[in-house]
C-alpha cells in the first residue's frame, strides 16, 4: 500500500471561517481526496443530471460536494430512501439513460485495462472460474448510453489495472458504426488520475497523488499509458472542500452510507 492509500494525519473536524479558501494541510483522508478529484472532473464538463449506482459512497460524496458548492445538478442516487426520484429501482435508471437524460455515471471493475474495458465477471475460464466478481449489472448499457463515465477504483495495482481484462463486461471503445453515446472521461484511483482518449483508445496520466512518483505509478499499472506534458501532483483538497465534505455532504449521506460516514468523517447517524 502506498502513502497515497494511508490515512492522513487527523485534523480538526472543520476549518476556521477565515481560512476556507486556503489549501488544506495533510489533514485529510484518501477517500476525501478522491471525492474532491471526482468533483473537479464533474465540474470540468457542463452537466445537468448525474446518476450514482449502489455501493458508491465516494462518487456520491463527490456529487454532493458539487451540489453544496452551488452546481445546479440533478442527482439520482440508487437506494437513497429520501429524495430519490426512482420508485422502481434500476428499471427507471435504464429508461432515463436510454432516453439520453443521464449525463454522467460512474463505473468500476474487478479489472480495468488500458482501453478502458471493464471486467465485472471474474478471471479464469468458464465455468470453473478462478475468481468471480459481482457481475455486470447493466454496466455495458450504462457505459454506451451515458454521455460520459468516470471510472473509479481505489485499489491501484497490477492485478486490477491489467494489460487486457480476462472478460469484457463493458467495452471502453467500439468498432466504427456501433452506436454509443459516450465514453470514459477519466479513471480515478488511490494513486493518480488518468484521462481517457477514446479516439486513440489510451489513458494518459493527468496527476499523481502525494507520496507517489511516475516510477511508482508505472510499477503498479499493468497497462501502458501516455504521460501528459504538464502532469504534476494532484492538488490537495482545500479547507472549504473538506469543511463541506465533513459537514453538509456527510449530512446528506448518513442515511445511505452510515458506515462510510463513521469511518471517513467520524460521524454516526443519530439513533
Placement of each model-derived feature along the sequence:
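Intrinsically disordered, low-complexity segments enriched in Ser/Pro/Gly/Ala and basic residues
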Residues: 1, 12-15
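Short, surface-exposed, charge-dense and proline/glycine-enriched linear segments
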Residues: 79-86, 106-108, 139-141, 256-271
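N-terminal active-site beta-alpha-beta segment that forms phosphate/nucleotide-binding
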Residues: 6, 14-93, 101
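Short secondary-structure junctions and interdomain/linker hinges
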Residues: 41, 45, 49, 224-228, ...
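A conserved C-terminal secondary-structure "cap"
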Residues: 229-271
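Alpha-helix initiation and N-capping motif
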Residues: 59, 211-214, 242
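Conserved phosphate- and dinucleotide-binding cores of soluble alpha/beta proteins
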Residues: 2-8, 84-237
Amino acid at each position: 500500500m502506498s502513502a497515497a492509500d494511508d490515512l492522513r494525519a487527523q485534523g480538526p473536524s472543520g476549518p476556521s471561517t477565515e481560512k476556507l479558501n486556503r489549501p488544506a494541510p495533510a489533514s485529510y483522508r484518501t477517500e476525501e481526496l478522491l471525492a474532491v478529484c471526482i468533483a473537479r472532473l464533474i465540474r470540468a464538463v457542463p452537466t445537468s443530471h448525474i446518476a450514482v449506482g449502489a455501493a458508491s459512497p465516494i462518487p456520491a460524496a463527490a456529487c454532493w460536494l458539487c451540489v453544496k458548492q452551488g452546481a445546479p445538478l440533478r442527482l439520482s442516487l440508487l437506494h437513497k430512501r429520501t429524495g430519490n426520484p426512482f420508485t422502481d429501482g434500476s428499471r427507471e435508471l435504464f429508461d432515463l439513460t436510454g432516453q439520453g437524460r443521464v449525463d454522467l455515471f460512474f463505473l468500476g471493475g474487478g479489472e480495468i485495462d488500458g482501453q478502458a474495458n471493464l471486467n465485472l465477471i471474474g478471471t479464469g475460464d468458464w465455468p470453473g472460474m478462478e475468481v468471480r466478481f459481482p457481475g455486470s449489472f447493466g454496466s455495458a448499457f450504462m457505459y454506451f448510453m451515458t454521455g460520459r463515465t468516470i471510472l473509479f477504483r481505489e485499489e491501484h495495482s497490477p492485478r486490477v489495472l491489467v494489460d487486457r481484462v480476462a472478460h469484457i463486461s463493458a467495452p471502453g471503445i467500439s468498432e466504427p458504426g456501433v452506436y454509443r453515446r459516450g465514453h470514459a472521461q477519466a479513471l480515478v484511483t488511490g494513486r493518480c488520475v488518468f484521462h481517457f482518449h477514446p479516439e486513440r483508445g489510451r489513458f494518459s496520466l493527468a496527476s499523481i497523488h502525494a507520496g507517489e512518483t511516475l516510477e511508482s505509478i508505472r510499477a503498479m499499472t499493468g497497462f501502458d499509458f501516455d504521460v501528459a506534458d504538464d502532469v504534476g501532483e494532484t492538488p490537495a483538497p482545500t479547507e472549504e472542500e473538506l469543511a463541506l465534505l465533513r459537514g453538509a455532504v456527510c449530512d446528506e449521506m448518513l442515511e445511505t452510507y452510515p458506515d462510510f460516514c463513521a469511518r471517513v468523517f467520524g460521524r454516526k447517524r443519530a439513533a
